[in-house]
Amino acid sequence: MNKQQLFENIKKKQSFLCVGLDTDIKKIPQHLLSEEDPIFAFNKAIIDATADYCVAYKPNLAFYESLGTKGMMAFEKTVAYLRENYPDQFIIADAKRGDIGNTSEMYARSFFDHIKVDAVTVAPYMGEDSVKPFLIYPEAWVILLALTSNKGSHDFQMTEDANGERLFEKVLKKSQEWANDEQMMYVVGATQGKMFLDIRKQAPNHFLLVPGVGAQGGSLAEVAQYGMNDQCGLLVNSSRAIIYADKTEAFANVAREAAHAVQKEMAGYLHDKGIIPCKA
């Protein structure tokens, strides 16, 4: 999916919501545990319930890898289900990969040749040669970690050099030599608030993947105010606040209501920016 297609889908659905599939076997409704594949059964129900109100899904690989072969099979089945039934959805593998060139090449093959996601999150710490193998796929996206939502982000990402330039700003500046805004996005945590103004000075046209809204306490209003550009430029992720909104047999319907509430708020911000003609 290219940038224009993503933007058109945002306008069509009046939403820039990404639903995070951080599926924890210990947190899904008890009645699903009798299913042959409880993780996939949960994901399928969440997807069917929320697809009308979001433009992207983001499975977090750690939750699937922790279950071994069965977990990875559930992940691959989830991606295949999305591809077959919801081809307009942007699929992000939240894997935070990044290693020396030949290792990154294998990671890229796994996600883009085999599993066929649209994007993968990548850590930039090892530099250009660890990122480039992901960029040889012209239809795929790299989502580079820039300024994350966790408290520990201040340990490195906010440190300044002698000229006052912060590390995350170096990442933004240098990485734009590797790819343009048609193939690269950045992870910026919702808890960073007004830092979006600084981000947009460095990356005015890039899409930003924004975790941290919902259970982590980030403000959607603040993200939209400071981070939205003329093509929206945002994919705001919500995981726990949607997928674990309820643990009874009604969990999917409650998740749908939670996603719809976020979508309606997003439609207002898109309208205020002049991206869509009227509120949903």
Swiss-Prot record:
Disulfide bonds: none annotated. It comes from the Bacteria. Pathway: Pyrimidine metabolism; UMP biosynthesis via de novo pathway; UMP from orotate: step 2/2. It catalyses: orotidine 5'-phosphate + H(+) = UMP + CO2. CDD domains: OMP_decarboxylase_like. Its EC number is 4.1.1.23. GO terms for biological process: 'de novo' pyrimidine nucleobase biosynthetic process; 'de novo' UMP biosynthetic process. The active site is at residue 96. One of its GO terms (molecular function) is orotidine-5'-phosphate decarboxylase activity. It is an enzyme of class 4 (lyase). Keywords: Decarboxylase, Lyase, Pyrimidine biosynthesis. NCBIfam families: pyrF_sub2 (TIGR02127). Belongs to the OMP decarboxylase family. Type 2 subfamily. PANTHER family: OROTIDINE 5'-PHOSPHATE DECARBOXYLASE. HAMAP family: OMPdecase_type2 (MF_01215). This is Orotidine 5'-phosphate decarboxylase. The lineage of its organism: Bacteria, Pseudomonadati, Bacteroidota, Bacteroidia, Bacteroidales.
